[in-house]
Amino acid sequence: MESLSQHTPMMQQYWKLKREHPDQLMFYRMGDFYELFYEDAKKAAKLLDITLTARGQSAGKSIPMAGIPFHSVEGYLAKLVKLGESVAICEQIGDPATTKGPVERQVVRIITPGTVSDEALLDERRDNLLAAVVGDERLFGLAILDITSGRFNVQEIQGWENLLAELERLNPAELLYPDDWPAGLPLEKRRGAHRRAPWDFDFDSAYKSLCQQFATQDLKGFGCDGLGLAIGAAGCLLAYARETQRTALPHLRGLRHERLDDTVILDGASRRNLELDVNLSGGRDNTLQSVIDRCQTAMGSRLLGRWLNRPLRDRAVLEARQDTVACLLQDYRFESLQPQLKEIGDVERILARIGLRNARPRDLARLRDALAALPQLQTALSPLEAPHLQALAGNIRTYPELAELLRRAIIDNPPAVIRDGGVLKQGYDAELDELLSLSENAGQFLMDLEAREKARTGLPNLKVGYNRIHGYYIELPRVQAEQAPADYIRRQTLKGAERFITPELKAFEDKALSAKSRALAREKALYEELLEILIAQLAPLQETATALAELDVLANLAERALNLDFNRPRFVEEPCLRIRQGRHPVVEQVLDTPFVANDLELDDNTRMLIITGPNMGGKSTYMRQTALIVLLAHIGSFVPAQSCELSLVDRIFTRIGSSDDLAGGRSTFMVEMSETANILHNASERSLVLMDEVGRGTSTFDGLSLAWAAAEHLAGLRAWTLFATHYFELTVLAESQPVVANVHLSATEHNERIVFLHHVLPGPASQSYGLAVAQLAGVPGPVISRAREHLARLEATSLPHEAPLREAGKPQPPIQSDLFASLPHPLMEELARLKPDDLSPRQALELLYSWKTRL
C-alpha cells in the first residue's frame, strides 16, 4: 500500500483503523451511512448485492465505495454473519461541530459468526458456538464458548476421528486453531475455521487469564486443573471474546469439564442418518426435534437440542428426569406451567447481552415481564413432589427489588434502541423529567410568558419568538419600543421592530437550548446505571435462567408424552433391549394411514437380528425407530412404544444409505466402507449398531462377502445389532452364530401387485419382491417382463441359497474372479512352459537377461 501521506486526511484515518482489522469488513460511519472502501467495498457489493461506486480520489486513484444506511444495518450484518464474514463497526465518537478535519472515529465492536449476540443476527432456537482446538493427532484440547449464554465447556479428545465427530455434533459458527498447524487439515474445510497465533494457546497465560476472569486462585474447583491442552484452548477463546466484544465479560463465570464417557456417542454419519435436528435435505422439517419440541421458550428449545445431540449414560440423572415428566403428567400439571413459561421469554440471552452491556431497551422490558411472572410460577411449583422439580424450583428465585426497579424504570413498550431516548418512565428520575419538560414544553412556556408580559406591560402587540441565530426574544413594534420595561435588554434591531431579552427568558433559553441533548445524555447514563445494577445480580439470574430452561424442556416432554402416546422406558442392569409396539416418532406424524407398530427383543442370548424383506417394506424405518427410541430414553424422555426395557448403551452407530463424497473424492461404496470400518473398530457389547444393505455398492459376491464378514464380526463383538440385507445367504448365520436371529418385514402379492404389511415376523423372508416394487415405481411393462425372464434364468443357474456355510476366519478359494486383479504377465506363461533340464548354462543366462529387459 502507498504511504499514508499520499492519502487525504480522511483516508489516512481510515487506513490506520483498517490496518488494525485486516481480516474484517470495515463498516466506517459517515453521517447516516456505513461506508466500505477499496477491497471491502468490492467484496460487500458482491455478497450483499449493493451498488459499487467510487468516491473522489486518494493517493491519485479513485476509491471504490459501497454504502449501507445505518438504520437498516442489522439486516446486512445478519446476511454477512450467515456467510461466515466478520465485521468491524467503526463509529464517529467526536463532535462534527467542534472538530477540525476528520471526525474522530473508533472501532466500537467486532461482529464475528461465533461472537455475535444481537437478537436480530441469531437463530433464537439454535446455539451459536465459538470453538478453539489445540494439540496433536493423538490428543486434542477443545474449548467451546456460547457467548450468548455464558456456557464455557472444555474437554480433551483422543484422535482426529473423535475430534471431527465432536465438531460435527457441536457445529460451531467459528473454530480457532493454531497458525503453526500444517495445511490441508480436515477441519480447514469447515466454514468459520481460521488460524490464530500459537502463543494465543499458551497454557501459562491462559491459566492466569482464566483465573482472573473467574476470580479464583486456580481451576481445580471446575474439575479441569489437569487439562493442559483444553485450558490453552479456553484461554484462546477468552482472549478472542475480549478482543471482539471490547468490554468485560461478567456473564462468563466458570468452566465445565465435559467427558465423552458421560454420554452416548453418535458419530457424524449416525447423527445425519437419524435426522435429529436436520433432515437429509438440510432442512428442519420432519426431524426428531421438529416432532418433540413444543418448548415455550427459545432457551428451552436450545437445551432440548443439546440433549438430543448429547444423550446421557447417567442412569440417576435420566430417572430423575423421568420422575419429573411423570409428575408433570399427573393431573395434567404441565398444562398450567406452560403458559407461565411462555411469559418468561429468552432470559438466558437477555442476561448475556446485559453482561456484554449491549442489551436493548426491549431486552429490559422482557426481563421485567419475566421477573414479574416468577412469583406465580414459584407458587405453581411448590406443591409438586418430584425431587428434581423441587431442586429446579430452588434455583428459580424471585427478585422483587429488581422487578420493581424495572417496573418503575422502563415504559411498557420501549423503542428498539436507547439512541433517541424515550425509554425511561416519567417519575423515575426528577432531573430527567425536568429536562424533558423543558424540551417538550417550550412552546407552552413561551405562550404563557407572552400572555404574562402583555398583561404586565400593557403592550398588546408584544410577541415572544425564537431565532436560530439570536435565540429567544421579546419583540415590540418600533413605536412601542420606548415603552419597554427597564428589565428588557435590547438584543436585535429590525427595520420596524426591536427585540429584547429578559433575565427570565435568558435563564429559560440556557436550559431549553441544551435540554434535549442533556435529557438524552441523562437518560443514557441512567440506562447504563440500570445495566450495572443488573450485572451485579447476573450470577443468581443466570442460575434461574438455566433452571427455567430445563423446566421448560421437562414440561414439554410431558406434553409430548401425553399427546403423542409416549410411555416411560425402564432402565435395567440386565443387558437387554425389549420394545413392545414401538413406533417411529417422525414417520407416524406424516403418514395418512395408521402406523404399524412392531416389537423388538434383544437380550444376552440374542444380540443380532438379520432383517430381510422387500424394498419399501419398512426395514429402515424399523431400524431407525429402534435407535430413536433408545436415544429418547437416554435424554430422560418417554418413548413411542407401549413399553420399553433396556440397559444403558455407550454408542449408537448407523450405516444407513450413502452418497458420493465428491469433494473428498470418495465414491458411494468408499463412503459406505469408511462408515462400516468405523463401526467395526469402535463398537462394543454395549453399542447399538444399525447396518442397512452393507455391500450393495460393489459386485454381488464381493458385497455378500463383505456383509457376511461384517455381520460375523459384530456377532463376535456381541453388539446390539440390527442388520438389514437383501443377501438372503446371510440368513444362515443364525445356524452357526447362537446370538443371531432372523426376522423379516411381511408383504404379500395380490393380482401381481405387492402389498406391504410392515409387520416384523420371526424368520427370514421367503422372497424379495424386487420386480413388484419396480412395477410399483412405474418401470415400463416390457422391462418388467424381460426382467422376469432374466430372473428365471439366473435362479436356475446361480448358486443355491442353501450352499453350506464355510467356517468363519478360514480363507477359501474365490468363486468369482476379481475384476481388478492383474492379468498374468507373459513371462509367467513362458516360465510355466520352460523345461530347465533342456537348457545349457549359457542359454539359461541369456534367457535370464532377456526376461530382465522385458520386465
Curated annotation (Swiss-Prot):
Residue ranges annotated as coiled coil are none
Under the GO molecular function aspect, what terms does this record hold? ATP binding; ATP-dependent DNA damage sensor activity; damaged DNA binding; mismatched DNA binding
List the Pfam families: MutS_I (PF01624), MutS_II (PF05188), MutS_III (PF05192), MutS_IV (PF05190), MutS_V (PF00488)
Superkingdom of the source species:
Bacteria
User: Which keywords fit this entry according to its UniProt record?
Assistant: ATP-binding, DNA damage, DNA repair, DNA-binding, Nucleotide-binding
Might you report a single GO cellular component term? cytosol
Q: Does the keyword Cytoplasm apply?
A: no
* Record: residues binding ATP: 613-620
Single GO BP term: mismatch repair
State what this protein does: This protein is involved in the repair of mismatches in DNA. It is possible that it carries out the mismatch recognition step. This protein has a weak ATPase activity.
- NCBIfam families per the UniProt record, alphabetical: mutS1 (TIGR01070), PRK05399.1 (NF003810)
By sequence similarity, the record places it as follows: Belongs to the DNA mismatch repair MutS family.
Question: What is the name of this protein?
Answer: DNA mismatch repair protein MutS
